[in-house]
Amino acid sequence: MGAVHNLKPEAQPKKRVLIVEDNLDAVHSMAVLIRMMGHEVEFAINGFAALDIARRFRPEVILLDIGLPDFKGYNIAQQLKWEPDLEKTRIIAITGRPMEEVRRKALQAGCEQVFAKPMDPAVLEELLAKEKG
């Protein structure tokens, strides 16, 4: 957590980050952390809200829970990649079940990377600092 406190928000461009997670405690923790890093955050707790908010907010990065109650994260990732203003959005899958099949399906659906919950704050900070490449 110390690395987060050393980050100067003005040192890097602010990103728009959408958190898609049905666990409100996890959403709150990630949102606070990402705001401390100097980024703008919105969140959705289900797939329908995720699509709606993504269309309006146009995030540069989406942290997407694979196991949502209404849609699988794979389906959301595929849908987002077809959206005209979102096809270049970086989608990072997060899952409580980091099995190889989950990873494979997430990558096939358009996710850039897959991480187990909870995400390490230093890894999250590095991901948000990185440009898509």
Regions found by a protein language model. Name each.
Residues 1-18, 122-133:
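Non-catalytic signal-transmission and effector/linker regions of two-component phosphorelay proteins
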Residues 21:
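Conserved acidic carboxylate
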Residues 57-63, 68:
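Active-site beta3 strand of CheY-like receiver
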